[in-house]
Amino acid sequence: LIESRSRFALVRRDDGRPDVVFYPVLESSPLERYDEAQQKQLLDGKAIIADVGTADGRHSKAFVQIDEGTKQVMYVPTPIIGRNLQVLAEIMHLGPVEVNGMQNGEPLTLVVDDEPVTVGIDLHDKTGIRFCSGDSQKWKEQPKREWDKYTFGVYGCWVMDDDGNLDYVPEEEYTEELWNEQKKSAERNRAAGLHK
């Protein structure tokens, strides 16, 4: 039996059927294809534009970022996030300097309704662009995924440890603490339903 931390994603195959993709936790990120400046930016948690090789042997430009949880290198082709950046630039009236800064991994802080709002490229977000109420420091500190300590499903519960890792516990293995948390969660959900 081999146990290893990993992330997984459900994807749809070309034939329309679902499949599971696993991303194991690596000891370190494979950064040898990036120059020293790019490696520094990636290790600082920034999304950068770099050349990537495709499955068919071609090269293209993509936004690249390290997934801190697995140390895997993620990438998204530049046109996908580029379109989202273009829409953002039009809505927020951003100039080329602001857009270029974001393309180089720097979050941008704006004032909206007298409050600071920070936006930047983050490949963890489904649009590739993440917003945060607050300054750039808060944007950098904000967790990429927000989960409760306990996330209950139909037959079990995902439990988050102090390091942000999730472990699945089937109902048969619930402790008294988990049963109590499930009752509290049900009460909160019931109360929220009454106030709608």
Q: Where is each model-derived feature located?
A:
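Short, hydrophobic/aromatic-rich segments at coil-to-beta transitions
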Residues: 1, 43-51
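N-terminal intrinsically disordered, low-complexity leader regions
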Residues: 1-12, 181, 188
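Beta-strand-dominated lipid-handling architectures at cellular/organellar boundaries
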Residues: 5-7, 16-37, 72-76
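One face of beta-strands
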Residues: 6-8, 46-48, 62-64, 119
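Short, low-complexity Ser/Thr-rich regulatory SLiMs
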Residues: 10-14, 66-68
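Tandem-repeat/low-complexity and Cys-motif detector
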Residues: 10-11, 38-41, 51-56, 98-100
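A eukaryote-biased signal for long
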Residues: 22-25, 54-196
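Intrinsic-disorder-associated interaction segments
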Residues: 31-32, 41, 66, 81
